[in-house]
Amino acid sequence: MSSSQSTSQLKRKQQTISSFFSKKPVAPNGSTTTTPKDGHVKKTIGHARVHEAPSSEMDVVDGAHDAAVRPDEEGDDDYQIILPSRKRIRSNGEVSTLQRGTLADIDNGHSSKGENELQTGIMGSSDSDRAEQPVKIKSGSSRTEKFRFSSSSLPSSSDPKGNGGCDVLYAISADGDASEDGDEEQKRKQALHQKFVKRLGGPDCLPFSVSRVDAGDAEEAEGAESDAEAEAEIVPVPQKGRGGKKTTTGKLTPMERQIIDIKKKHMDTLLVVEVGYKFRFFGEDARVAAKELSIVCIPGKLRFDEHPSEAHLSRFASASIPVHRLHVHVKRLVEAGYKVGVVRQLETAALKAAGENRNAPFVRKLTNLYTKGTYIDDVEGLEESSGNSGSASTSTGYLLCMAESNAKGWGNDEKVHVGIVAVQPATGDVIYDDFEDGFMRSEIEMRLLHIAPCEFLIVGEMSKATEKLVQHLSGSKTNVFGDKIRVERVSKSKTAAAESHSHVSSFYAGRMNAKGTTGDVAASNLLEKVLTLPEDVTICLSSMIKHMSEFGLEYVFDLTKYFQPFSARSHMLLNGNTLTNLEIYQNQTDHTSKGSLFWTLDRTKTRFGQRLLRKWVGRPLLDKTELEERVSAVEELQDPSKTVQIERLKGLLSKIRADLEKSLIRIYYGRCTRPELLTVLQTLQLIADEYVHLKSPADLGFSSPTITTAIAALPAIRDDVVTYLNKINEEAAKKDDKYCFFREVEETDEITESNLGIADVQHRLQEHCAVAAEILGKKKVQYTTVAGIEYLIEVENSPYNLKKVPASWRKISGTKKVSRFHTPEVVQYMRERDQYKEALAAACDKAFHALLADISTKYQSFRDCILALATLDCLLSLANIASQPGYIKPAYTDKTRISVQRGRHPMVEQLLLDTYVPNDIELHTDETRALLVTGPNMGGKSSYVRQVALISIMGQIGSYVPADSATLGMLDAVYTRMGAFDNMLAGESTFMVELSETADILKQATPRSLVILDELGRGTSTHDGVAIAQAVLDYMVRNLRSLTLFITHYQNLSSMAREFPKGELRNVHMKFTESGMDGQDITFLYEVGEGVAHRSYGLNVARLANVPDSVLEVARAKSAELEEKIRKKKMLALAKVAKGFINTDGDAGGPAPALLERVMVGLEQL
């Protein structure tokens, strides 16, 4: 067989190996090939013979890699990348030469005589063979370096055998006679051979199968470079131990060192790290993220302290998410209560390649921190969508800081001084307060329930009672906020007060200097206001400034205009028990907003309107004038004669899709995106344009000053908004195109300079087409783009055309028809263009943030406009409620009075399908100021008293009320003591909690308060319970003179009404009818009637609760027995009174009035 025929046959049989080279392997000079009967090919190279396997056997080893390199051999594949030939492999500074045709045979792993000859052929070939066309390449990555020959495999003078150190593989004599070795030696060779194949046998392990692209090349992608870092981390570099054996190293990769350095500074944070085109979690963070996000976690090291227990692991555990899904997953982690940090790459591939650190890993830094209270990077935030689903938690997004000091007293006499600062980063609102609290911590609880924070920041140590309260409110997802609350703690030094005052002073002085408002009188007054805050509040404010600085949100404290004290007495006080018992913000069943008073009144169309209405509900007005103005506005907004103006307002609100309040504060923080900024400005322009034509308030068509003032504030911002919109390219902003975001006339010098540089490079690239055409001998050459690689020059695959291609041109890709090249000039121009693009991106970002800063100077005027719009939204919501049938406008009086005819429970009425039974109520400080309410269990007593309180609260919010008529006085507070529960954490029984809350009410209530007490005294014996209930009720009526609703099952208390001849205390009961044998069946009428219900009908409730009949029979018998005993005692007592009445001396003027009353009471009870 001729040499040419054998060569073509060899090519067909070695398809997998030929795919690794740009040129087909050619047999060296002097080589001959023969084909024996067994189908194996013997090829002689010099004096060595090569025994090769058929291609079918070779495909088993390398077929997978061949398919990866050449996905479609027969088709015209545009994505086939031609890899350069690799003939020499650098290892430890030396060069070894391998013939192309031999590595495939090594890879096959045959243990035959021909293989022995192969090894001698490799190691024993002449110098002239090794010098044949050497190709040197740079040392590869740690992944490929693992699989390279070491210099020990080359012949050296120190080698006693003179076989080039072939003991590492296996040494064979030049003539290939394997029979000269003994059986033991042959086994040793076989074992060494298998070890070699195991090391070099995988398709991915061939050193020349990995594409080697110079790091300085312009076309090198950023993601590829970053992913290479990840590969380096996943596959560590093995090194030799002392005994020559390979051991796994504990050496960290550069990226691992970066991660550990950042993690050590933020051990309480889940880090998500940008690596190329993915964000990755490492170590324990990966395990947590995989659990919360339901993503895959690749096993590995979990600890970051290089603990010996994980020495057997060579990499960190990891989990990854796509870049475009970052905020989706971050939001889920934040909602789960974690603190999440985003670590980003701070340099791009193009600038990195041109810089001095081109061979170093990407610079990474923690750029964002998020928690529940500080997550504002998503305009949707963590709130539910606008509507009335009522399924979300009632948290408001406040971050509350609390400090406690001066604990004095012990037990029930304990007093603590508390300071709080609560900030809502999404809106810029700041609430502060300073107060003293008792051992029940009712003041703290009230503020926490009102503010409903999503995150606590505790400064220093708390007392046990306060600590237990915080744990109770934040410990689980079933707490009163309906969600788990994050708690962070910071230390408090002994000199905290002085340090905090100094820190706050320097912070605001620095902010004023930066803004240039040092001499501004208004700014100085606001600064004075901040610096005169109480000591504990200042400590909290300082801690909050430091805490928010970690998240880049400290600017929120610049807005001192929006600092509001919590305990301003311009509002009705609703304490924690009242908020819970009356279901102001959430129901008591599943702790959602559905069924609450806020849910009932919420008909708002915007998010910022909904937030304002929530404040209105929790802070009813005390100022009668302000209240009447609000109610008049609500009345005017349902006037049929003004339907056109009202519909115009509703249409304007319905067009607003964005949460303007949140977006505005994001602009202030510099966190706003380009599309979001365009949306905000366009929405503000829409709002301003709606009433820009109006010249005076009279043109509005409304007479209410509340409405006209709010509408007049809308057009005031139009000029500023139009000025900013004129700077923006609308189409580019919609597409988030940073390069064309500004109109051409508004571009900065840096942007213009970068654009000119890019244009110049592109011009030179076009001119280079003519040069390339001249070299190729063509009239015209055009660039093409394939697989994202630009400026490729295509050359047809013919010997005539390919001969014209200079050696300096770099082949990038090709098909069967064409090859694609980059010229050195194109590479240089692309590098310049990428550098200009990076500079352009930086200039565009700088200009955009400068625009946001400019808009921030108008924050207060824009915020006032949004607040005016929110006010209109709330008024329209209340008008919607007022338009429902059965709602009337209440009349207000300066006297402490509640007079309601046919009032109804506002929430139960909406939730019940049946008609709600209305009831009357008449309370007045100078007349009847207390009602003693009795009646059967489940008769509607609690619903009745709640209805009275809710109507009073609704009236002072400014809403219409569900009644036929209502006259309401200005109540300063509503206090409730309802329900039975203990406090095991504080070691307090149900009765203890009941009396403690009652004691707080007796201390705080005033003659202008409404007090509701439900079954006081039931937690102890009957005698003690009656005594306590009677004493408390008497104190409420005689001393406090508060409006009181007292529910009880103690019929003996009804006699107290006779002690108040002017009717200050009156008995009422819930009506019912009896039927059936012995009156066992009763029908609840849910109507309030005069008098006392002398039975509670508890057995009826037991029957409704499906208590077993046998138990009911025993209970019924015992009840009858006890009633009979009591009846006999009363008859005996009445008989004695009657005897005394008969024996009374007629000359004395008849029986005493007290004696007559006792007779009447006895008869009434019987």
Swiss-Prot record:
GO terms for molecular function: ATP binding; ATP-dependent DNA damage sensor activity; mismatched DNA binding. Residues 1-165 are annotated as: Disordered. Residues 1-21, 117-126 have a biased composition (Polar residues). ATP binds at residues 935-942. The lineage of its organism: Eukaryota, Fungi, Dikarya, Ascomycota, Pezizomycotina. Keywords: ATP-binding, DNA damage, DNA repair, DNA-binding, Nucleotide-binding, Nucleus. The keyword Cell wall biogenesis/degradation does not apply. The keyword ATP-binding applies. Its main location: nucleus. GO terms for cellular component: nucleus. Residues 62-72, 107-116 have a biased composition (Basic and acidic residues). It comes from Ajellomyces capsulatus (strain NAm1 / WU24). This is DNA mismatch repair protein MSH3. Residues 246-373 are annotated as: Mispair-binding domain. One of its GO terms (biological process) is mismatch repair. Heterodimer consisting of MSH2-MSH3 (MutS beta). Forms a ternary complex with MutL alpha (MLH1-PMS1).
